[in-house]
Amino acid sequence: MGSTRKGMLNVLIAAVLWGSSGVCAQYIMEQSQMSSQFLTMTRLIFAGLILLTLSFVHGDKIFSIINNHKDAISLLIFSVVGALTVQLTFLLTIEKSNAATATVLQFLSPTIIVAWFSLVRKSRPGILVFCAILTSLVGTFLLVTHGNPTSLSISPAALFWGIASAFAAAFYTTYPSTLIARYGTLPVVGWSMLIGGLILLPFYARQGTNFVVNGSLILAFFYLVVIGTSLTFSLYLKGAQLIGGPKASILSCAEPLSSALLSLLLLGITFTLPDWLGTLLILSSVILISMDSRRRARKINRPARHK
C-alpha cells in the first residue's frame, strides 16, 4: 500500500473512531448516570497518562516543557482553555442533546478559525472562505431550528455548549503550534490532557461513588479512553503527516457521519431531513476551507515567472 493510501486510510479510520467515541460517551452517561464533568476528568487523566507514556517510550523528553517557565505557563493556558474546555463542552453538549449533534456543532471550528484570522489580519476572505462561512451559518440554522426561526429543535443549553465547544476546538487547534513545534505533539497534548483532568479532580472526585458500574460500562470506558482517544489520535497524526492537513480535514468529515449512523444503530437516535441538510452544509464548509488552503499552498509554491 502506498504512503498516500495508507495516510488516507489512517485518517478515515481515526475519523470513524472519533465519531464512535462520542456515541460511547453518550452511552456511558446514560447508562451509568455519570456526569459529564466526572467523565471528562477521568477521560483526560487516563488518556493523558497513556499519551505521555507513549511519548516517553518514543524517546521524547516529556519533562522539558515543564522545566521552561514561559512554556509551562503557555501549557497551562492550553490545558485549561484548550484540552479541558473542548472536552467538557463537547460532553456537556452530548448530555444536553446527543453525540451526533455535538459532533456536528463542533465542526463549526474551522469556519471560526478562518473568520477570526480574516478579522485579525483585516483581510477580505476569498470566495471559498466566504461560501464556507455562509454554508456553516445556514447549516447551523437548519440543525438547531429545522427551518423554523421561532423555535429551537435542541435545548438552549445544548446550543450554547455546542457553540462553546466549536470555539474551544478552534482555540485547541491554533494555540499550541509553537509548543508543538518545540516539544512535539504527544508531550504537549498528553500534558494538556493530564493537567486538565487534574484541575477537575478536587471538584468532582467525590462523584466516583454516585453512578452505576458494570462490565459493559467498564468496557465502554476502556474503548473511550484507549481506542477513541489514544489510538485514534495516533492514527490521525500519522495519516495527516502522510497526506497533509487539507486532505486530512476533508476525510475527517467522516466523523460526524459515523456519529450520526452509530447513534441511529446503537442508541435509536434519528436525524430528520433538516438535520441531515444542516449537517451536510456544515461539512461542506470544511471541504471549502480545505480547498482554499490547497489553492493558497499551490499559489505560494508556484515558481515565479521570469521575463
Swiss-Prot record:
Task: Choose one Gene Ontology CC annotation of this protein and give it.
Answer: plasma membrane
Q: Which residues lie on this side of the membrane: Periplasmic?
A: 1-7, 67-71, 121-124, 173-184, 238-263
What highest taxon heads this organism's lineage? Bacteria
EamA domain mapped to chain residues: 16-145, 167-291
Which UniProt key words apply to this protein? Cell inner membrane, Cell membrane, Membrane, Repeat, Transmembrane, Transmembrane helix, Transport
Q: Which residue spans traverse the membrane?
A: 8-28, 46-66, 72-92, 100-120, 125-145, 152-172, 185-205, 217-237, 264-284
Residues in the Cytoplasmic compartment per record: 29-45, 93-99, 146-151, 206-216, 285-307
| Record family assignment | Belongs to the EamA transporter family.
Q: What is this protein called?
A: Uncharacterized inner membrane transporter YicL
Its gene name is yicL
